[in-house]
Amino acid sequence: KNNFDKASRNIRVQLGQKDRFRKGIERSGLYLAEIKRILKQYGLPEELSVLPHVESSFQIGAYSSAGAAGIWQFTRSTGRLFMRVGYDVDERRDPILATYGAAKLLKRNFESVRSWPLAITAYNHGLQGMKRAQKKFGNDFVKVVEKYKSRTFGFASQNFYAEFLAALHVVKNQNKYFPNLVIKKPINITSFSLPEYIGVRTAMDFFDMSRDEISKANPSLRRPVLNGEKRIPKGFHFQAPAEKVSNLVARYGQIPQKVKYGSQLSSKWYTVRRGDTLSGVALRFGT
């Protein structure tokens, strides 16, 4: 009885997770094959492809109170170690580009601690924290969870690996738990690395795409680019649905040189001075 009482105190229930998980499985079809391919490319087990279920339920627009973004929930600081995170482009928001970053991070974690429970927990808690825990308790993950003390090693980090295992079990038995799933099919995308900077209006005109279509096909493009304040950067891998745009390279060749640029538009910055008000600054810049 005492063991059951002790176990019951470690159980926490969240309502509404079943429907959220079902939708996540259905959404995952858009990206799962490519995610598994990337993990294999980095020599990682394909089971890691369920981590976005834990992090975001495969919602590309997911954004946490801590500033983590995208299906892999990279914070800005960690994201910058593995991908482009800036004012014009935020690759954390692109499911495929972020997967390359996640693969690099997970590979680094595992090569450092040589234990998947610790490496996966490090994805949430941070590698240095897990290395400190490993130094005290070795690879005994149960001891790490029960005895490792750190201000930041709270409920979420302690249970992250358990959530991963639960998600893996559900995904492997998805038809049992979720009959009649409607899995979304991958979108056939064509992409092209831009040799110069171009404006979003130019892209709309010559690639025959609406602003919304460009945004959906290129989720890493941020609002300043989409509203014309910034240009689509040189070297950016512009993406379009293959059935919509058959040959991006040929279409790019039709763009006049006068609307291709060698540099980005400068940002409009204003230093707030004593006595300024928000409405006054907005009026100054017409916003």
Feature map (PLM): residue ranges:
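Alpha-helical scaffolds flanking conserved acidic
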Residues: 45-53, 69, 116-121
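A short, acidic/glycine-rich surface segment
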Residues: 60-62, 224-225
